[in-house]
Curated annotation (Swiss-Prot):
Residues covered by region (Disordered): 54-96, 150-171
Main function: Plays an essential role in the inhibition of host immune response. Prevents the establishment of cellular antiviral state by blocking interferon-alpha/beta (IFN-alpha/beta) production and signaling pathway. Interacts with host IFIH1/MDA5 and DHX58/LGP2 to inhibit the transduction pathway involved in the activation of IFN-beta promoter, thus protecting the virus against cell antiviral state. Blocks the type I and II interferon signaling pathways by interacting with host STAT1, STAT2 and STAT3, and mediating their ubiquitination and subsequent proteasomal degradation.
Molecular-function annotations in GO: metal ion binding; molecular adaptor activity
Comp. bias regions, Polar residues: 54-65
Chief location category: virion
Assembly and interaction partners: Interacts with host IFIH1/MDA5 and DHX58/LGP2. Forms with host DDB1, CUL4A, STAT1, STAT2 and STAT3 the mumps virus V-dependent complex (VDC).
Localization (cell): Virion; Host cytoplasm
Any one annotated GO CC term: host cell cytoplasm
Family the UniProt entry places it in: Belongs to the paramyxoviruses V protein family.
Keyword Metal-binding included in the entry's annotation: yes
Protein name: Non-structural protein V
Length: 224
């Protein structure tokens, strides 16, 4: 038996294979008939039964109709983003200190860089980065005059932790927020005896020695 294929037989095999390929390529596509990742509809199990693979299961018509009616009430919902959130990247954070009256503070609006136009959830992140960089470069704390440090004695306690702290003063605090597509920096003073909290808020003096105003917050109240 001759194990070698002749040249004319090779041409016939190639022509036959090309005809078979052209037949399937020219045939109209009725739908997805194979179990592939693209043919599976994301969702719960009742919805998955309604895939094109259902025709390969026994009793295709009855099972397919029943699965579609069951899947329609299976609780699968589409997520709809409100127009307000889709346009500006989410709910705007109100400034927590705006509602308080009788307190001094300075509000600085830092506009967004026109070269950066983030959308969605990344918008607030980009705005916060811009505001943080500009705030760090703009607000530089003045060097403080060094005070003599007393000798430490074990058990003597700290003067800053006692309610009768004779050295009252203020500390400067900042709060970053974005409103209407703008980064706003709000700065104010709090007594040094007040606690440091994550939320932006005003505190009153607890030791009785902190001044009402200091050289840092005098400009917060405007001209006298």
């Amino acid at each position: 038996m001759d194990q070698f294929i002749k040249q004319d037989e090779t041409g016939d095999l190639i022509e036959t294979g090309m005809n078979v390929a052209n037949h399937f390529l020219s045939a109209p596509i009725q739908g997805t008939n194979s179990l592939s990742k693209a043919s599976i509809i994301p969702g719960v199990a009742p919805v998955l039964i309604g895939n094109p693979e259902q025709k390969n299961i026994q009793h295709p018509t009855a099972s397919h109709q029943g699965s579609k009616s069951k899947g329609s009430g299976s609780g699968v919902r589409s997520i709809i983003v409100p127009p307000s959130e889709a346009g500006n990247g989410g709910t705007q954070d109100p400034e927590p200190l705006f509602a308080q009256t009788g307190q001094g503070g300075i509000v600085t609006t830092v506009y967004q860089d026109p070269t950066i136009q983030p959308t969605g959830s990344s918008r607030s992140v980009e705005l916060a980065k811009i505001g943080k960089e500009r705030m760090i470069n703009r607000f530089v704390e003045k060097p403080r005059i060094s005070t003599p440090v007393t000798e430490f004695k074990r058990g003597a306690g700290s003067g800053c932790s006692r309610p009768d702290n004779p050295r009252g003063g203020h500390r400067r605090e900042w709060s970053l927020s974005w409103v209407q597509g703008e980064v706003r920096v709000f700065e104010w003073c709090n007594p040094i005896c007040s606690p440091i909290t994550a939320a932006a808020r005003f505190h009153s003096c607890k030791c009785g020695n902190c001044p009402a105003k200091c050289d840092q917050c005098e400009r917060d109240y405007g001209p006298p």
